[in-house]
Amino acid sequence: LLVASGWRQLEIDGDNAYARERIAGEQTIFDAATALPLAEVTEHVLAALGFVGVAEGAGLQLLGVPMPAALKDLAESGLNFEQLRERRAVPLRSVFPDLAGDVVLVDPGVESEVLEAGRWLEADAEARLVADALDGGAAAAVLPYGVYRLTRTAVDTPDASETWPLGTEIHLAPGDAFAVTAPVAGVVAVATDRGVLLDLRNGWTLSIDGVQAECAEGDEVDPGTRIASLPARDATRPVAVTLCRADALEGATPPILALDVPDEGRAQLVAPERVAAWSRFTFDPSALLSIESRTQRDESGDEQARREQIFASAQERYYDRPMQIERGWRHHLVDTTGRAYIDMVNNVTGLGHGHAGVADAVNRQIRILNTNSRFLYRELAEYSERLLALLPENSDLDTVLLVNSGSEAVDLALRLAQAATGRKTVVSLREAYHGWTMASDAVTTSAYDNPYALENRPDWVHVADVPNQYRGTYRGDATGAKYAADLGADLDALATQGRDVAAFICESVLGNAGGVLLPEGYLADAYARVRAAGGLCIADEVQVGFGRMGSSFWGFEQSGAAPDLITIAKPMGNGFPIGGVITSKRIADALSSQGQFFSSAGGNPLSCRVGLAVLDAMESEGLQENARVVGARLADGFRALAARHDLIGPIHGEGLYLGVELVRDRESMEPATAEAAAICERLRELGVVVLTTSERSNVLKVKPPLCLTSESADYVVAALDRVLTEGW
């Protein structure tokens, strides 16, 4: 209706700009809706409106759940569920009465324990799962109906893979010929050398695909009637059993029955976005086959509601309607429907998700010893020495204090600086984020995380100007001296007020701004001025350090600066909670004036062993170099897009900490905040997880695991290009 009226309006008034602008979007909606059969679209609409389908209602009846009268009528017009209940017996014997031996249900799902370490990406992953079951002596291996198959998940693709099977797939071990019997009564509708289709005379059909028919079309059969045979076989043979509404078969896209397609004997699959309809068109045949039902639905909405019941409103989350992530591998995340996403935001898992070395380290150490750091064990010193060895050659830092997070690390660093100087005042930069503890939050000034950040700083915190080359008081790289001079003026003013500075804290790269590099010379000059004023310099490397810059291990090395204290965390444990402060013994020993320091879990054997595994992997896998190479490729790709799309402003950062700033006008620098949010949503639809940052929420933050490949980087650039070209 919208399309027709739109075109009619343009016929009447061809200069109607509003109608011409709207017609393109309305035509897109129309084309998408008409690309599927009407029956399927109808079921999607009914599902969205909350109407329970025949199959769903019948399923409730099968489970013994009372049903409303209207649903009961629908269910009674469908399958004879009492008949199904009576057929419960030895697995698969209702179809293969001569089958002898165990039947194994194979788990090809997203949370399958046998698909770890990226095994699911192998082309023959599914076949190997079946082979493993049969090699173990099983007579049949079953891939269940309705279980989203991780084995069918493809990565770096704009469309979700077809992962949800419409039938049960049975793989039979090599052996002699089998008789095939009807598990329910019906009329033979199709009989070929590829399978049999039974009309159950109630609006439903049952297909058994991958067998040779021994019946004729029109034959009436009872439960147990021989209808086909499975020939003798030297190799594994698949047979698919599908319960489907008759009205879904005609014109179905794709064909639902395996006998309609060349890949005989295998259940057909649909993409997650089509499950709402096809779960109403099909039904789980497990009861017919006397096997366990494992049907899955996308329950992310229920999981989100469950979380909201126990979460505080202040606790952050990604996306208003988030996907439910239950697996990760390297730089990919996979949701419960088998949809894969490139993870472009997870700087916590620097090595990548599911890293075997970290998992093995945890498994081994937790079985041997895990206690607190007041006991003597070798892992603590070994890990601390490895961290110190990563410092620049001229560094005089020689002491490590381990905690459990970046917030704790910043909190401890501030306490150390105040103890060592005997002063209280701390200078932090505007628009900075440093943590959530009392002290680390006090020096956090970002309105992005706290809209009231600048209104409620304690009196011991002084906020200095942020040296943002793009949006700051001074613009361009040759502004470091000006920003440093302004900081020096702040320090002088504080001294005049009797507020001598204890510490100056800043990120070595402006992470919260989207990876904005500090102006040349700023950090070294700022450190010199702080030290001249008697203060100490804290480099917050929690986000930007640990190899992410590519050209250097630490962010402060980019500026040729040497901090007095370094805070580290996020990637240290690849998701395992580890944080720390690296400093000098002179500064660390000052803490004794305030009592003893101890962290129950900080520096325990398990944390240290994980930390060592991370460092080993970073070295053996060349991840810092990968960050340099792939990061440069990404940045070049984004800059090439900027030449074609005016919405892209500057590309910030280095290595694999980048920011793509979106602006409505490059001269005025008006932030494209709404556009950035919409683009992130559209990128998610295309299989890329990227989110916004900065005070204006208009910068796409790019900080993926350091194992990001060139192929995935190219896909991200192409996806962003597509969104900017087609719209969002």
Regions found by a protein language model. Name each.
Residues 291-728:
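Conserved N-terminal phosphate-binding loop of PLP-dependent enzymes in the Aspartate aminotransferase
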Residues 186, 218-230, 338:
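A structural signal for short beta-strand/turn segments enriched in small hydrophobics and glycine
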Residues 28-30, 194-217, 248, 252-257, ...:
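Active-site region of chymotrypsin-like
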Residues 164-168, 174, 181-214, 237-240:
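Zn2+-dependent peptidoglycan hydrolase active-site motif and core
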Residues 67-72, 248-252, 666-669, 710:
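Short, charged/polar, Gly/Pro-enriched secondary-structure boundary elements
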Residues 73-120, 216-219, 229-292:
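Acidic, glycine-rich catalytic/binding loops that coordinate metals and/or anionic ligands
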Residues 1-72:
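Charged- and aromatic-enriched interaction segments used to assemble
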Residues 112-181:
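Short glycine/threonine/proline-enriched tight-turn/helix- or strand-capping micro-motif at secondary-structure
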